[in-house]
Amino acid sequence: MQAPALAPLLASLAAQGVHTAIETCGAAPAENFALVAPHTRLFLFDVKHAEEEKLRAVTGADIAEVGANLSFAAARTEVIARVPVIPGFNHTEAEMEGIFRFALSHGVRRVDLLPYHTLGRGKYAKLGREYALDAAMLTKEDLLPWKALGESLGLDAGIGG
């Protein structure tokens, strides 16, 4: 997030009545969120995992930093947690429940589940790179049990978004 450059732009847009939104994974210094939050009406916040080791191994992110930024954003404006559901990474009941509880503990009330897809496979081939995750694409129907789980915990859960 390029917060020092983005904050004045967001402020100008917000002053003109333009709806402002930021998509983030939350792996950024807290001061960045402090700069942009006053001018942001919606954060689309990627939450990939709730286990520190798994999150760090795959994304390099610090779960404490992500959680602190998620809490900060949720206390100030609307936040939708977006959970990419990825086979072999976060696709078990325990992992999904952990993600939902993590989101709830940081003030999030809305979660959108995003089914894993392989749309980037062709780009990797053109770059001569291996597509690391060779798993089948998930459908909306595959995510219905996770949607029901999220709702049972008190979340407004959706698929897609």
Label for each model-derived stretch:
Residues 1-114, 119, 125:
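Conserved AdoMet/S-adenosylmethionine-binding subsite of the radical SAM
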Residues 101, 125-149:
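A structural motif corresponding to the C-terminal lobe/cap of the Radical SAM core domain
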Residues 94, 100, 104-106, 114, ...:
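C-terminal accessory regions of radical SAM enzymes
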